[in-house]
């Protein structure tokens, strides 16, 4: 059984990475790879959205992957929005002091609206 499923889609120039399950040191590679691939799906994405609504556990490795994606997006001038409606994702980000560093929203619709031109 897979502990993490990660999908990747594009709509209106926004690359969306959707994760469901547990992000830990054994599964983080899949999330990191999809976040990195998100930039190549469209010539210049308006935004990359990491939808972690279905994530039940976010370990330090997952936080590090989000920071790396944030840095990569910043270098390319593309905002990264993190959808984190649940405590399993928000709490690690809060403890690490990243709520003001990352663009964290409670629902995907908010990220989609903010990514509009």
Model-derived regions, located:
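STAS-like cytosolic regulatory interaction modules
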Residues: 1-57, 68-117
